[in-house]
């Protein structure tokens, strides 16, 4: 019988990577490269290709170098997930978001030699944030969830330590 935690991992990875790929497919099929679709005053869909990693970092690395780095990171994160206690739900949830996002972008790199990005935040002609995709959002959200969980754990340990030392 498959453990609940493994089922959670597989379902989470399938949902995150699958949703990312579905949106990218829609963008590639319906928006020519360089096309912008304004959604609301500060948010547009804008179809671009990114040969680097986050915010075009490592764009000078070879295609296979970026794929190798991504696979190594995914393996390490899976190891972390496996070695995280079952009761640390937020930690595991954050790891699933990060791994799923990494897999979504890895699929693009293997298939197309680039990642499709399409989310653009901006303020008129004053400020433009880096264009990114849903996989990047999952990765960022996963990091935030893990940081919140770690902060929560640290604060609880500090409270418990203060409580026991005052007696």
From Swiss-Prot:
The active site is at residues 117, 136. The keyword RNA-binding does not apply. InterPro entries: Peptidase_A8. Its EC number is 3.4.23.36. Pathway: Protein modification; lipoprotein biosynthesis (signal peptide cleavage). One of its GO terms (biological process) is proteolysis. Its main location: membrane. It comes from the Bacteria. Signal peptide: none annotated. This protein specifically catalyzes the removal of signal peptides from prolipoproteins. HAMAP family: LspA (MF_00161). This is Lipoprotein signal peptidase.
